[in-house]
A protein has these predicted regions:
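Condensing-enzyme catalytic core mediating Claisen C-C bond formation in acyl metabolism
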Residues: 1-25, 139, 224-289, 293, ...
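N-terminal extracellular/periplasmic Venus flytrap/periplasmic-binding protein-like
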Residues: 10-12, 23-24, 29-32, 40, ...
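Active-site pocket-lining segment
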Residues: 159-162, 198, 205, 275-344
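Conserved active-site "lid/cap" helical segment
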Residues: 1-61, 65-69, 73, 80, ...
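Flexible glycine-/small-residue-enriched beta->alpha junction loops
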Residues: 109-163
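Conserved catalytic cysteine-centered active-site region
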Residues: 55-109, 151-156, 221-247, 328-355, ...
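Active-site-proximal alpha-helical scaffold in enzymes
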Residues: 84-116, 165-194, 254-261, 326, ...
Length: 390
């Protein structure tokens, strides 16, 4: 069976909440990276067989967000599209589904990734259709309800992270130091231009004219000195804060996948080969440590040891999520999120899964290394992982 390869990819800069990308919808962000990734792959839009794209906060966007994005990108109407909602794992699941579809021989070229405008997530009136009749009504935040809260208990994801940080014995200082390190790495990556090859510039109309957004918004704005002074976010005496958590963000990332045989026969350059994938599920309250088992599974399938991996992208939904497998599996922290993670760059929930794969590829290329693993936790108790080789 022919291996599955990634022949191109791109991402937008990560915009802050109500920040640089707030004027754009998720499909508009998605369109930018779909268009750019197809162009970088050196294929025509009509050669694409399917677009599989993650988007979690789809209320108010309109029918078929992935279909909207591909049409805005100039992909012809005969190409199908599907929108994936696997919470924070949506974009990585899109890549996994693309890989499986290609393995099955049901397609030759698939664009997979994700998009999210958390800024534009609407508020919801749950009882409006039946009528409020009398008294005060309730308004719900789509971002919280469908993105950041546990469906059964209504608890915020961060409260579970706080519980697990307590269980694992991670201190406030340890998590703050991890977040500060992430910020410093991201700041260096931005100032040194390490992200330039990943990012497609996006035009945003403002009152002053058209502004080109081509740089991650949040890392250079962060004040590192304030991090140790921030108040706990999820409990009075807690240790998790806004700084050692990922920030609410907007953005999109896409990858173009095909088989190694197709790439060779059509003269397409290969960025990376997908060596193995995995998913893991456990109790919803334990989602923050699900990446540990997902990593173990993907390494077993790849036939790799922990030490063989040259670089890791472990999504920093919270600093402790990345810290847990580092401590549990003996991962060299110097190999983790080498250009910074979500504590610094942000976490547009429907897009991060493909963003970290793309960032991993370019980090490996810059470092002259070969093997990498990308993994992220998912609300509901799950995690997904991908092992790639340059």
């Amino acid at each position: 069976m022919s291996s599955i390869v990634i022949v191109s990819g791109s991402r937008t800069a990560m915009g802050g909440f109500q920040g640089s990308l707030s004027a754009l919808t998720a499909p508009e962000l998605g369109a930018a990276v779909i268009r750019e990734s197809i162009q970088r792959a050196g294929v025509a839009p009509d050669q694409v067989d399917e677009v599989i794209f993650g988007c979690v906060l789809s209320a108010g966007i309109g029918q078929g967000p992935a279909r909207q994005a591909m049409r805005k990108a100039g992909v012809p109407d005969h190409v199908g599209a599907v929108t994936i909602n696997k919470l924070c794992g949506s974009a990585m699941k899109a890549v996994l589904m693309a890989s499986d579809t290609l393995k099955a021989g049901s397609a030759n070229i698939i664009v997979a990734g994700g998009m999210e405008s958390m800024t534009n997530a609407p508020y919801i009136l749950p009882k409006a259709r039946g009528g409020y009749r009398m008294g005060h009504g309730e308004i719900k935040d789509h971002m919280f309800l469908d993105g950041l809260e546990d469906a059964e208990t209504g608890r915020l994801m961060g409260s579970f992270a706080q519980d697990m940080a307590n269980t694992k014995g991670f201190t406030r200082e340890q998590m703050d130091n991890f977040a500060i390190s992430s910020l410093k790495k991201a700041q260096t990556a931005i100032t040194e231009g390490y992200f330039k090859d990943e990012i497609v510039p996006v035009e945003v109309k403002t009152r002053k004219g058209v502004e080109v957004i081509d740089q991650d918004e949040q890392p250079l704005k962060a004040n590192l000195e304030k991090i140790p002074t921030l108040r706990p976010a999820f409990s009075k005496d807690g240790t998790i804060t806004a700084a050692n958590s990922s920030s609410i963000s907007d953005g999109a990332a896409a990858l173009v996948l095909t088989t190694e045989e197709y790439a060779q026969s059509h003269g397409l350059n290969t960025l990376a080969k997908i060596v193995a994938t995995s998913t893991h599920s456990q109790h919803p309250s334990e989602f923050t440590i699900a990446p540990i088992s997902a990593i173990q599974k993907v390494l077993e399938r790849a036939g790799w040891s922990v030490d063989e991996v040259d670089a890791w992208e472990i999504n920093e939904a919270f600093a402790m999520v990345a810290m847990a497998p580092i401590h549990e599996l003996g991962i060299d922290e110097a190999k983790v999120n080498v250009h910074g993670g979500a504590c610094a760059l942000g976490h547009p929930i429907g897009a991060t899964g493909s963003r970290i794969i793309l960032s991993l590829i370019y980090a490996l290329k810059r470092l002259g290394k070969k093997k990498g693993v990308a993994v992220l936790c998912i609300g509901g108790g799950e995690a997904t992982a991908v092992a790639i080789e340059i």
